[in-house]
UniProtKB/Swiss-Prot annotation:
Keyword match Mitochondrion: no
Name of protein: Large ribosomal subunit protein eL28
Upper taxonomic lineage: Eukaryota, Metazoa, Chordata, Craniata, Vertebrata
Natural source organism: Xenopus laevis (African clawed frog)
Keywords: Cytoplasm, Ribonucleoprotein, Ribosomal protein
Entry's Gene Ontology cellular component terms: cytoplasm; ribonucleoprotein complex; ribosome
């Protein structure tokens, strides 16, 4: 159960990081424009 939870947390953090990066990229794009 602990290992499964760890994997889920890793997946969640990974997706969150990518989504945050995407948002930051969009914001930077807007600032440049």
């Amino acid at each position: 159960a602990t290992s499964y939870e760890k994997i889920t947390i890793n997946k969640n953090s990974r997706s969150t990081l990518s989504s945050v990066r995407h948002i930051i990229r969009k914001n930077n794009y807007r600032k440049d424009l």
